[in-house]
Amino acid sequence: MFCYQCEQTDRTGARPGCATAKGNCGKDETTADLQDLLIHAVKGIAQYGALARTMGVRDREADRFVLYAMFTTLTNVNFHAARFVALLREAAQTRDRVKAACDAQARATGAALPALQGPAAWQPADDLPGLLKQAAAVGIDAGLDTVGADIVGLRALVLYGLKGVCAYAHHARVLGYERDDIYEGIEAALAFLATDPTDVNALLEQALDLGRLNLTVMELLDSANTGRFGAQQPSAVRVSPVAGKAILVSGHDLGDLHALLEQTAGTGINVYTHGEMLPAHAYPALNAFPHLVGNYGGAWQDQQSDFAHFPGPILMTSNCIIEPLPQYRQRIFTTGPVGWPGVRHLEHHDFSTLIRAAQALPGFPATAPEETITVGFGRHAVLGVADKVIDAVKAGQIRHFFLIGGCDGAAPGRNYYTEFAEQAPDDTVVMTLGCNKYRFNRHAFGDIGGIPRLLDVGQCNDSYSAIRIATALADAFECGVNDLPLSLVISWFEQKAAAVLLTLLALGIRNIRLGPTLPAFITPGVLNVLVDQFGIQPIGDASADLAAALSRQAA
């Protein structure tokens, strides 16, 4: 096992990374190795998928499988080794089906079919020991002694960014939104990685290409969310419980939540959101369900405490799951790409078992005094009052904007984001997105001339909204985004955040502060390139960084 894809990776050894029997995320070495092998297998599908496109052949089910398989390998998504064995078998069958279609097309047209090598020629071993032996040769650090840490780190940057792209594309796909150019870009990147690239410039350009592709994917997901559920609207969300039977929904998948709301209508069961599901309350088609009563708990890393105290069943719809404690192991369910050994997995939006569990559990005995927070400041809401915002800037009422967002986590140093937000002067506006918001979203920030000082833009994928807001302001002031009174203070944890970071870099956005630590796969040599080209810098002291951001604007 070797893995350093997330922020919580082990950094105590000579080389950062989890390389023991169990990673810091809870992933055991068998699962980690099978995930490495699944990525290898998916590269083989992509090699034939890319070839098939040149021959006019399409296999949409193969495209979709690539998204799903990649999603299962993200941090805190799937820990179920047996499911990865099954996915490996399915990957080989999928690859062979695409290859057979290429063969048939070549015969029909008289074209010569090239003999693809590497992952395209891989065949799964017959048993688990054999699969693990195969995995040992294809891990993320394969070739380290030959090509060096910089090349391995750049390959990891591309792969991890690609995982985030696939996750966002999967979210859009399950809502009925997909595009062939997105599948083509994803499979081209996987096929590129299948060649074991060693050219620094080619790797950096591929990373930026993925950033551009991810912008397209986030735009598609934005269209999917708004197309299915309406544009986000500023909405008050209850954060105190209501008496009655209850189900808690965590993760990111709005489609799963909608299906559950439909199935629980009229049952007397109240539904609560958790973690990154909080923005669901801002979508009209979801907020219209009266039994979507509120949000419970905090960010993903608080789930063991939150879930233990919740008096009903829990549904995990996507990342991020942590090892379930005995207090709730029998009442947590997974769906979609999520998995944990011994936890019941629900398929095809059939939540009848979950609903029966809710009816059998006590629920909340009493209604607590009402407490609310406000969400729903996506691009439609903010750009709808753009004139008011622009006038406030011109009048000197708004001096600066801060985007303080991204993934939260349990590592020391994340209080920085709370301190930064709390210390932001009263004439500044804080935009936030992702679960990092839980560090300060219950604080009273007030408003500036009726404009809330804290604007919750949405989930991590709503970085697209934040980008649209920033570019609209730049257009209004006839300047570039880097010339705006805007600072990006980003908290990263996993591969979706890596994809968003690549998008920001591809857009030429500079001087991003990133923390709480820099990615372990970003070697000093690669970091020098990112600093030189993009001005990326690690977070430091909140007060000093805040002063530097404001002084940069003044200068």
From Swiss-Prot:
EC number: 1.7.99.1
Annotated compartments: Cytoplasm
Cofactor(s) required, per the database record: [4Fe-4S] cluster; hybrid [4Fe-2O-2S] cluster
Annotated residues for binding of hybrid [4Fe-2O-2S] cluster: 252, 276, 320, 407, 435, 460, 494, 496
Pfam families (UniProt xref): Prismane
Cofactor-binding details, from the entry: Binds 1 [4Fe-4S] cluster.
Protein's GO biological process: response to hydrogen peroxide
Keywords for this protein: 4Fe-4S, Cytoplasm, Iron, Iron-sulfur, Metal-binding, Oxidoreductase
GO cellular component: cytoplasm
Role according to the record: Catalyzes the reduction of hydroxylamine to form NH(3) and H(2)O.
Family: Belongs to the HCP family.
The protein's name in its UniProt record: Hydroxylamine reductase
